[in-house]
Amino acid sequence: MPVNSTAVSWTSVTYITVEILIGLCAIVGNVLVIWVVKLNPSLQTTTFYFIVSLALADIAVGVLVMPLAIVISLGVTIHFYSCLFMTCLMLIFTHASIMSLLAIAVDRYLRVKLTVRYRRVTTQRRIWLALGLCWLVSFLVGLTPMFGWNMKLSSADENLTFLPCRFRSVMRMDYMVYFSFFLWILVPLVVMCAIYFDIFYIIRNRLSQSFSGSRETGAFYGREFKTAKSLLLVLFLFALCWLPLSIINCILYFDGQVPQTVLYLGILLSHANSMMNPIVYAYKIKKFKETYLLILKACVMCQPSKSMDPSTEQTSE
């Protein structure tokens, strides 16, 4: 979309300001998430390892993606492949988030489906393999345009390799719509919705059976129900934040027109998702809220770190 290169509009100034604020909140919030998991041995379980992976992706969004998005919004003239690599980095961490969410959903499904065998199935080695696979897939999907699926035009004029860096100047929209969105965002979202539907179905059946069984079994599935609701909310917020921008990309691909302000709002909403998860954890997971408060108290009151030792309260894996 044409943008005046001689001056930065108020829309751009507002966009950049909000990007910076969102980035700072995302970094601080997700560093706290990792800190909480580190402080609480009861949270150092399979699910929370994947939550840490999600937090790392969100930190990367704040540290790398948002500054790069600002550079791209300004249309700075750089080499084609430098611009392309910047846009690819932005995609990598989006897919790292969706892969982490998928891993979390699969883990919760195994937790309620294979209650007895769960610990034997989710070994430390398999957890690390799953984490590695999540990030490997994210890098492969995000870097695909670097291997040829891009807007590069063959030309003998070397000057044409430098251009104002804009997302659509280097990134092909058929890649964004069919490969990135349909295949690697929409399909995993549908799969995760099906997984959570099955999780709630299993929990409901087990809870109904627990009335005639042990109280311990009922308590276990009650905790699993609360945990599943919290993680489903995280998934819902991801879909709510990312689908508008994906729909905008579809409109642009099919030659539709989208006002620059609407495009900025879509980008900001997608980036805002990176700062939402820490808030959800604090609101829905008691152990997170307690440790957030302990960390805040330690920072404000300058108390020694030993005062932040977590309580021995049990937490669902």
Curated annotation (Swiss-Prot):
It comes from the Eukaryota. It is a multi-pass membrane protein. PROSITE patterns: G_PROTEIN_RECEP_F1_1 (PS00237), G_PROTEIN_RECEP_F1_2 (PS50262). InterPro entries: Adeno_A3_rcpt (IPR000466), Adenosn_rcpt (IPR001634), GPCR_Rhodpsn (IPR000276), GPCR_Rhodpsn_7TM (IPR017452). GO terms for molecular function: G protein-coupled adenosine receptor activity. The keyword Cell cycle does not apply. It is found in: Cell membrane. Residues 1-14, 73-84, 149-176, 255-260 are extracellular. Glycans are attached at residues 4, 159. Most abundant in lung, spleen and pineal gland. Moderate expression in brain, kidney and testis. Disulfide bonds join 83-165. The keyword Cell membrane applies. SMART domains: 7TM_GPCR_Srsx. A lipid is attached at residue 302 (S-palmitoyl cysteine). Keywords: Cell membrane, Disulfide bond, G-protein coupled receptor, Glycoprotein, Lipoprotein, Membrane, Palmitate, Phosphoprotein, Receptor, Transducer, Transmembrane, Transmembrane helix. GO terms for cellular component: dendrite; plasma membrane; synapse. The chain crosses the membrane at residues 15-37, 49-72, 85-106, 127-148, 177-197, 231-254, 261-283. Receptor for adenosine. The activity of this receptor is mediated by G proteins which inhibits adenylyl cyclase. PANTHER family: ADENOSINE RECEPTOR A3, OLFACTORY RECEPTOR AND ADENOSINE RECEPTOR. Belongs to the G-protein coupled receptor 1 family. This is Adenosine receptor A3.
